[in-house]
């Protein structure tokens, strides 16, 4: 039995998230369906670094699976690329140590959120970015983001549906990239993220850029440990990308 590590990307627009769910199209289900065919009807379970929600994309999701097939990692990659749908891509497949774990072995992740600042709505980017035709003060967004860096209890910045007992996470950095006059990308790097955390942080920073909230409001929200104390909305899913997963 050999363990394999794969880095995959996918367009989340046509999926009801990553995780298998009854009677819905998910990333996990499509990959496991392909592996089952390769293993002549035998079920093969995959494990990912984490789940993504409906409409959320991935540029560098990491999965692992075990197989008894006597084929090279390169052939696995080629076969899975052919046997999975067009909205999933296998960037790499390699043999991994038997104790490698895509989920529990992570030491950090990077998410990016893409914002289109065009005055006129672009239908061709609607599934891949948030359309935000309002003025933004990037300097204010950067000032607000500084209050979020470091180790904090992020209860106020995650969904009430979060299943984790501890809401303490460390944000290493929040960077802002103006790729062009119309595109703003916010990159979040941390040791882990809670359910809807990046989307709530994005909504908060957009409010800061509009002058609706101040850096002090963010500090108060962090200390309140209560999502209801934060007025910012959760940014929609289509602008969010799981960009990279780090391991030791």
Swiss-Prot record:
A Pfam short name: PseudoU_synth_1
Annotated family: Belongs to the tRNA pseudouridine synthase TruA family.
Q: What does this protein do?
A: Formation of pseudouridine at positions 38, 39 and 40 in the anticodon stem and loop of transfer RNAs.
Organism of origin is Listeria innocua serovar 6a (strain ATCC BAA-680 / CLIP 11262)
GO BP of this protein: tRNA pseudouridine synthesis
Spell out the protein name for this chain.
tRNA pseudouridine synthase A
List the InterPro entries: PsdUridine_synth_cat_dom_sf (IPR020103), PsdUridine_synth_TruA (IPR001406), PsdUridine_synth_TruA_a/b_dom (IPR020097), PsdUridine_synth_TruA_C (IPR020095), TruA/RsuA/RluB/E/F_N (IPR020094)
Q: Which reaction does it catalyse?
A: uridine(38/39/40) in tRNA = pseudouridine(38/39/40) in tRNA
The EC category is isomerase
């Amino acid at each position: 039995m050999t363990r394999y590590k794969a880095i995959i990307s996918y367009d989340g627009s046509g999926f009801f998230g990553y995780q298998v769910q009854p009677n819905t199209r998910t990333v996990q289900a499509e990959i496991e369906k392909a592996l089952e065919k390769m293993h002549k009807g035998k079920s093969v379970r995959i494990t990912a670094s984490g789940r993504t929600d409906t409409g959320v994309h991935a540029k560098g999701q990491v999965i692992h699976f075990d197989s008894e097939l006597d084929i090279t990692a390169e052939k696995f990659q080629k076969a899975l690329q052919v046997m999975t749908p067009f909205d999933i891509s296998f960037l790499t497949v390699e043999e991994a140590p038997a104790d490698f774990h895509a989920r529990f072995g992570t030491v950090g992740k990077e998410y990016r959120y893409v914002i289109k600042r065009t005055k006129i709505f672009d239908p061709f980017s609607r599934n891949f970015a948030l359309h935000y035709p309002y003025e933004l003060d990037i300097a204010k967004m950067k000032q607000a983001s500084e209050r979020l860096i470091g180790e904090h209890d992020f209860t106020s910045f995650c969904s009430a549906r979060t299943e984790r007992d501890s809401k303490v996470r460390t944000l290493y950095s929040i960077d802002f990239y103006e790729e062009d006059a119309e595109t703003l990308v916010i990159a979040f790097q941390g040791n882990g993220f809670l359910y809807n955390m990046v989307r709530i942080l994005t909504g908060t920073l957009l409010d800061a850029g509009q002058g609706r909230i101040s850096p002090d409001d963010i500090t108060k929200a962090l200390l309140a440990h209560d999502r209801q104390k934060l007025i910012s909305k959760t940014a929609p899913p289509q602008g969010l990308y799981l960009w990279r997963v780090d391991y030791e």
